């Protein structure tokens, strides 16, 4: 198992089992033809959906949203009933949101008004690897390099979550210790080139982590789903450890082969177009679209594989909580033939570089003293 301990793997598996159990309890809402046959049946379905997802709407808002809920329910049921795609949809917590609200709240948070920071580590370290020599499947969750699924809430912080997945991963690979890191520090403190809940870019976040000496733990600086004052110095008093990186590299754009080279060695941050209805209500299976390449959401690729029907896929960790998709993950079709990969997954991929094999003690990082 190399540097990653068996204890880490067992702990990750236990956490995953508990998360799956919790998801099944809160979000399993069957939908049949009879649920859509009349207004009364649809109202009953809407009430069951609200109860399952613990959504409370006042009377006027409920009536305003009911039309959207009906449209979404018909879209989901029609897709699943046709059965002409290898993935299914379900009525998740976005059930009574229209596309405009969904985009404004949960996607569209990759900042485009400032350029991404150039890589501080030149080149592409995995370029010499032969694709034919790569393992047929990779899953960094099974190797203990991925923390549990998190939830960004109503904050445009996907860029921070995507960044953290990759940094947590390479740190676990290098040190054998899986440490949950703080997205909130990035939201509050990485303000020169990123903009908290209003969006940001993963490349900029990697450079912030490098230039400021590391990233503190989630336990010391927990997530609040809102931008606040940078309190990293105070949080450091409760955290003797900060995770350091040497910088980042970009995966050559639009190359799924190069993305595979990188993912075979570590989790990788990517951007995708996630604002479509099919992505919004994804439940299970290999996602084959519809989606374009208007990149609006940061996620992380933590593996790849081949489904039973022979379709290759990327394993993607999202930040919409464990009740979305496959316990918080989506399998996106790999090698689809689309330029830049399906949903643009290979267009803007990057990953942190870490050679220092131990988490750094906070007291060793003089750069933080001025925070």
Curated annotation (Swiss-Prot):
SUPFAM superfamilies: Cysteine proteinases. The active site is at 158, 297, 318. Residues 29-133 form a propeptide. One of its GO terms (molecular function) is cysteine-type peptidase activity. It comes from the Eukaryota. CDD domains: Peptidase_C1A. Gene3D superfamilies: Cysteine proteinases (3.90.70.10). Glycans are attached at residue 130. Residues 1-28 form the signal peptide. Disulfide bonds join 155-197, 189-230, 291-343. Pfam families: Inhibitor_I29 (PF08246), Peptidase_C1 (PF00112). Induction: Synthesized by the aleurone cells stimulated by gibberellic acid (GA). Repressed by abscisic acid (ABA). Keywords: Disulfide bond, Germination, Glycoprotein, Hydrolase, Protease, Signal, Thiol protease, Zymogen. One of its GO terms (biological process) is proteolysis. Its EC number is 3.4.22.-. Belongs to the peptidase C1 family. This is Cysteine proteinase EP-B 1. It comes from Hordeum vulgare (Barley).
């Amino acid at each position: 198992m190399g540097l990653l301990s068996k204890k880490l793997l067992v702990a990750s598996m236990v956490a995953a089992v508990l998360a799956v159990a919790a998801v099944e309890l809160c979000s399993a809402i069957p939908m049949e033809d009879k649920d859509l046959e009349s207004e009364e049946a649809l109202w009953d379905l809407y009430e069951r959906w609200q109860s399952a997802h613990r959504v409370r709407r006042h009377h006027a808002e409920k009536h305003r949203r009911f039309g959207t809920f009906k449209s979404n329910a018909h879209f989901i049921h029609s897709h699943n009933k046709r059965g002409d795609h290898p993935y299914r949809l379900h009525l998740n917590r976005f059930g009574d949101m229209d596309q405009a609200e969904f985009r404004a709240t949960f996607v569209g948070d990759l900042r485009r008004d400032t350029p991404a920071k150039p890589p501080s580590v030149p080149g592409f370290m995995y370029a010499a690897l032969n694709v034919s020599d790569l393992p047929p499947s990779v899953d960094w969750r099974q190797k203990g390099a991925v923390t549990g699924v998190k939830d960004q809430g109503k904050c445009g912080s996907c860029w921070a979550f995507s960044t953290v997945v990759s940094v947590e991963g390479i740190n676990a690979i290098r040190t054998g210790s899986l440490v949950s890191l703080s997205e909130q520090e990035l939201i509050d403190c990485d303000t020169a080139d990123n903009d908290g809940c209003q969006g940001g870019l993963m490349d900029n976040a990697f450079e912030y982590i490098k230039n400021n000496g590391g990233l503190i733990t989630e336990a010391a600086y927990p997530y609040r789903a809102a931008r606040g004052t940078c309190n990293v110095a105070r949080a450091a008093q409760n955290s003797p450890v900060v995770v350091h990186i040497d910088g980042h590299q970009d995966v050559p754009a639009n190359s799924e082969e190069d993305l595979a080279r990188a993912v075979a060695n570590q989790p990788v941050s990517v951007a995708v177009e996630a604002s479509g209805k099919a992505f919004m209500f994804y439940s299970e299976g290999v996602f084959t679209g519809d989606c374009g390449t208007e990149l609006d959401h940061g996620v992380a690729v933590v593996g790849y594989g081949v489904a039973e029907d022979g379709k290759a896929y990327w394993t993607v960790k999202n930040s919409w909580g464990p009740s979305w998709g496959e316990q918080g993950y989506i399998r996106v079709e790999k090698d689809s033939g689309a330029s830049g990969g399906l949903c643009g997954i290979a267009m803007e991929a990057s990953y942190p570089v870490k050679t220092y094999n131990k988490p750094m003690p906070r007291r060793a990082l003089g750069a933080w003293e001025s925070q």
